Amino acid sequence: MGNNYEINIVHLYPDLLNLYGDRGNIACMEKRLKWRGIDAKVHMCTNQDGSIDLKAADIIFVGGGSDREQEIVCSLLIEKKEELKAYVENGGVLVAVCGGYQLLGKYYKTANTKIEGLGILDIYTDAGDTRLISNVVLECEKFDQPIVGFENHAGRTYIGENHTPLGKVKFGNGNTGDSGYEGVIYKNVIATYLHGPLLPKNPQLCDLSLIHISEPTRHSLIS
């Protein structure tokens, strides 16, 4: 039986951004909350119903998609840009994977076009000549266990000095293929190229996100 509080998870545009079963990340959050007696309600923000109530959001998830789909989603979210940025700056929890990771930055530049990002993170992405495809193992100082996943991206993402990489690449390519690092942690944002899905493969990363949501959740996750 659940407690008398409920966690609201907002899934941004799963109809457009859902590569490699990214929906599994939502299922993982729901399950790990349920195991601790915490109810979760998932709000799907889709291309058909794009209403977003960020004031009610405890956690936001955005998955991966093609360049074309990223461009569509960015155009749909642009009017919410400042609200999303305020959500992040005020400690809102956000998990972004692959295309969602790129979308949070300043821009994604391909050979033919430049897709303006939401500018929420101090990152930018340039397309490379080849795709970076590999299983990935990361060393993260926050955890005893490595972070694992699968990457498949043409973008090379460069992060600003005020952002911390998610982890050090022990196997695979990472953000640029040669930086030695993968992903970004900024405030309560986790952004990464890793599929898997990410959170079922790395429950410690899921709990790191959930623990920042609210005081009741924090106590349940720690206990």
Which role fits each region the language model picked out?
Residues 1-70, 218:
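Extended, subdomain-level signal for the structured scaffold at the beginning of enzyme domains
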Residues 13-16, 124, 196-197:
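Residue-level signal for short, function-critical loop segments
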Residues 137-187:
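Catalytic beta-strand/loop cores that center a nucleophilic Ser/Cys/Thr
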Residues 176-209:
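A glycine-centered loop/beta-turn motif at secondary-structure junctions
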Residues 59-63, 95, 193:
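Structural motif
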Residues 211-223:
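Single conserved hydrophobic/aromatic residue that forms the stacking wall/gate
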Residues 37-41, 70-75, 127, 169-172:
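Short, flexible loop segments at the rims of nucleotide/cofactor-binding pockets, characterized by
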